[in-house]
Amino acid sequence: MSLLTEVETPTRNEWGCRCNDSSDPLVIAASIIGILHLILWILDRLFFKCIYRRLKYGLKRGPSTEGVPESMREEYRKEQQSAVDVDDGHFVNIELE
């Protein structure tokens, strides 16, 4: 005897959808939440690099330059740029004082 003959198989009526009364508020709420969850999950997977990079670095804009003379701002920009300039793919050693 095969195993399939020993297992009770559901009748054709039991395969049907049992949620014919879909006007139940709980069913409607669950459906809406499920659809929103699916949409948010898809958007998260598509844009996760942008989203998490924005969350991680978005608030860190650097030190405030309010009230600092323009000459000092320019000097600071040049120092920062020279610290991260890389030529021909070599690493730059930055020594902290």
Swiss-Prot record:
Site (Essential for channel activity, possibly by being protonated during channel activation, and by forming the channel gate and the selective filter): H37
Site location (Seems to be involved in pH gating): W41
Entry GO MF terms: monoatomic ion channel activity; proton transmembrane transporter activity
Entry keyword Disulfide bond: yes
GO BP of this protein: protein complex oligomerization; symbiont genome entry into host cell via pore formation in plasma membrane; symbiont-mediated suppression of host autophagy
Chain residues carrying a lipid of type S-palmitoyl cysteine: C50
Record-listed Phosphoserine modification sites: S64, S82
GO cellular component: host cell plasma membrane; membrane; virion membrane
Stretches in topological domain Intravirion: 44-97
Keywords: Disulfide bond, Glycoprotein, Host cell membrane, Host membrane, Host-virus interaction, Hydrogen ion transport, Inhibition of host autophagy by virus, Ion channel, Ion transport, Lipoprotein, Membrane, Palmitate, Phosphoprotein, Signal-anchor, Transmembrane, Transmembrane helix, Transport, Viral ion channel, Virion
Annotated localization: Virion membrane; Host apical cell membrane
Region called Disordered, residue ranges: 60-83
Record-annotated membrane-spanning stretches: 23-43
Residues with attached carbohydrate: N20
Pfam families for this protein: Flu_M2
Subunit structure as annotated in this protein's UniProt entry: Homotetramer; composed of two disulfide-linked dimers held together by non-covalent interactions. May interact with matrix protein 1.
Note: When the channel is activated, one or more imidazole moieties of His-37 probably become bi-protonated. South Carolina isolate has been sequenced from formalid fixed-lung tissues of a 21-year-old male which died in 1918 at Ft. Jackson, SC. Brevig Mission isolate has been sequenced from lung tissues of an Inuit woman buried in the permafrost in a gravesite near Brevig Mission, Alaska. This sample was recovered by John Hultin, retired pathologist.
Its biological purpose: Forms a proton-selective ion channel that is necessary for the efficient release of the viral genome during virus entry. After attaching to the cell surface, the virion enters the cell by endocytosis. Acidification of the endosome triggers M2 ion channel activity.
Entry remark concerning the domains of this protein: Cytoplasmic tail plays an important role in virion assembly and morphogenesis.
Family named by the database record: Belongs to the influenza viruses matrix protein M2 family.
Protein name in UniProt: Matrix protein 2
Species name: Influenza A virus (strain A/Brevig Mission/1/1918 H1N1)
